[in-house]
């Protein structure tokens, strides 16, 4: 493991997807993609409905990079604060930056970005991993993320969708249908999306 087994396990919250199941989804996505031979340090995993980041923490544990989109400000803050506490407790060298993101000329989201490494020597040499926690609408993925920047996309849809957008509850099918073009644009050719829902799509 690139970081400790406890990274995805310590953060507890209502609605958290089972870690073993989420890890299986990551394995499925990688196996179905064109990136099995790609070195871990180059793989970018995106959770477009990230919640508090279980999928991203599992990706980091493997040595991948992680980027998450989440509409809930409280969830993004909790994930960012947790990551800060974890890195500091384990004395892992890191740099955190917080910034606003622009969508069509207006502030469309905020990003908490962590750059860290498994050793001080690797950090100094630039051999690092990145976690990006973006508070923004997943339907704006094409504006919030660069085209062809993600190798794998893994999410547990109900947790993200139940947050709604702008104070309203959106259907799972409606939200995903609206988000799909943007998701497709940020996936690299050969990339794979894997989404789980216990509900039935229309």
Q: Where in this protein do the model-derived segments appear?
A:
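Class I S-adenosyl-L-methionine-dependent methyltransferase catalytic core
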Residues: 1-202
């Amino acid at each position: 493991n690139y970081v400790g087994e406890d990274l995805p396990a310590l953060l507890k919250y209502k609605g958290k997807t089972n870690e073993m199941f989420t890890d299986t989804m990551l394995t499925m996505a990688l196996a179905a993609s064109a990136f099995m031979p790609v070195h871990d340090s180059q793989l970018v995993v995106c959770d477009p409905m990230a919640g508090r980041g279980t999928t991203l923490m599992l990706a980091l544990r493997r040595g991948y990079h992680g980027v998450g989109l989440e509409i809930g400000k409280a969830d993004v803050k909790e994930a960012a604060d947790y990551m800060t506490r974890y890195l500091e407790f384990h004395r892992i060298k890191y740099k955190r930056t917080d910034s606003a993101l622009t969508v069509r000329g207006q502030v469309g989201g905020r990003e908490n970005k962590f750059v860290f490494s498994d050793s001080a020597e690797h950090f100094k040499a630039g051999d690092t991993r990145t976690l990006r926690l973006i508070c923004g609408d997943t339907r704006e993925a094409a504006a919030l993320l660069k085209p062809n920047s993600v190798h794998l996309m893994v999410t547990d849809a109900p947790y993200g969708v139940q947050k709604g957008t702008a104070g309203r509850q959106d259907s799972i099918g409606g939200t995903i249908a609206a988000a799909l073009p943007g998701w497709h644009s940020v996936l690299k050719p050969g990339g794979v999306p894997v989404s789980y829902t216990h509900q039935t799509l229309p």
